């Protein structure tokens, strides 16, 4: 068994000060697995389960089990251990793609603004009654504002294709499909693994939103949102996290306190880079919304 240890668990993405961002744990576990296989083998299928909250104040050990090693395939199982308890499990396998879905025809990132750029404009519109928002949306906006006020800088810039739909202002929509462009800040260079890990890190950022944002129309206020599992299939080995990519997120079903979401990621030239799925816990202390 190979063991890797980290104390770097704090990011701007975490929902609370003591709970680690799931995408970070996923990316670190992937890095640990890749460190135990031949350089010629690239990760394709990754299946993970979030078992317990990961405390950012405590170190995590990643235990990598070498399940199978062959000339063309290897399988690794990674267990994230904190205080003797398994908090996260990831299984990694390689594979290849033979066809792909076409990239959707959406607005280019060049014509869009990032979330931080629209906050001041949005506050002015609300103050002058040109935009009226529901309490659930007001709470959501304040969350973004707190991050800006505290000068918390994300690793990525995200530009939603429909900012009104993304935040829940303007003409309300019940669409459960959302499109966003994203890229990492700064230049990452040609390190294949670093780019891959950062792309994996970011896949956990927006998927849950496709489940609860459509319910803003009913003033739905989620009281708990957390990932139960996260699965990624990488169709391309070479990817640049510091170049613009289009992320499509869709929620196909929600009920009984859970929701299922899917994601597809294209690079700017239309190549499908990866597909992913996620099941989340989605709860509210307020109204029950149905759309």
Predicted feature residues:
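Terminal targeting signals and extreme-terminal segments of soluble enzymes
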Residues: 1-291
